[in-house]
């Protein structure tokens, strides 16, 4: 399955969804599972507020976690199986495209696969087969 994701500073955008690029971590299950990602024994509410603008989006795991949430939302919208293989199409700003391309690909495609998590209480098991990177704004058109 091909999924285009725009990792913006303000919002994460896919073909069917747009939600704020903020994330809040909890050590316990929040009062609602709406927009909640469970990963690595922690809970993350996705789309809450905004995170500070980072010069390097790979500085922490926030954009990776938001990517998992975006993939889960797209899988749910498309009625696809929650255990599947995914190719991500993502954009990078032109200014850092050549410099960040390899590291952003590795950031979005971990060496430990498949990736298991829960989103809104639903278990997912994904194999991220490939990450295709394009100049920002082009990924939606390319895949």
Spell out what each predicted region is.
Residues 1-143:
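Nucleotide/phosphate-binding catalytic cleft detector across ATP-hydrolyzing
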């Amino acid at each position: 399955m091909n999924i285009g994701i725009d990792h913006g500073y303000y919002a994460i955008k896919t073909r069917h969804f747009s939600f704020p690029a903020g994330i809040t971590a909890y050590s316990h299950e929040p009062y609602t599972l709406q927009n909640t990602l469970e990963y690595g024994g922690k809970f993350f509410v996705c789309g809450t507020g905004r995170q500070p603008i980072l010069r390097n989006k790979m500085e922490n795991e926030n954009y990776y976690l938001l990517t998992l949430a975006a993939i889960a939302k797209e899988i749910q919208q498309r009625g696809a199986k929650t255990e599947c293989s995914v190719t991500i199409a993502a954009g990078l700003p032109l200014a850092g495209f050549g410099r960040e391309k390899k590291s952003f690909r590795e950031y979005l495609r971990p060496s430990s696969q498949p990736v298991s998590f829960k989103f809104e209480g639903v278990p997912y098991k994904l194999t991220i087969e490939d990450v295709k990177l394009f100049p920002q704004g082009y990924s939606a058109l390319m895949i």
